[in-house]
């Protein structure tokens, strides 16, 4: 009986924490770039953020230069799932060094 109480308590805590995480997510903008693989990744990210974390997600049209520039100057969109960073590498690295942007992975 004691282990059943522990399991129930753990479940209640787990679901409570999950609800808080969903409430804190807010609205996230994702760049839907103008090539097929990037469009696919944007939709996968949208699905994960909406279904897994309860976020409100808005897909915004994008292309390499305008999206990178907007991210560096305005902080939007929040996510660019696939971006040809070598075309804007120096400016992006500077924005990262200044703390305005973060790479999800080093490439």
Task: Indicate residue ranges for each PLM-predicted region.
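Hydrophobic alpha-helical segments
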Residues: 7-8, 20, 39
């Amino acid at each position: 009986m004691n282990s059943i109480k522990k399991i129930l308590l753990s479940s209640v805590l787990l679901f409570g924490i999950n609800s808080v995480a969903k409430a804190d997510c807010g609205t996230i903008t994702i760049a839907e770039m103008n090539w097929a693989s990037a469009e696919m990744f944007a939709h996968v990210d949208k699905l994960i953020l909406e279904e897994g974390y309860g976020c409100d997600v808005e897909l915004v049209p994008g292309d390499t230069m305008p999206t990178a520039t907007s991210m560096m100057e305005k902080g939007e969109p929040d996510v660019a799932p696939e971006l040809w960073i070598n075309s804007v590498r120096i400016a992006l690295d500077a924005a990262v060094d200044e703390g305005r942007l973060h790479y999800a992975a080093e490439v």
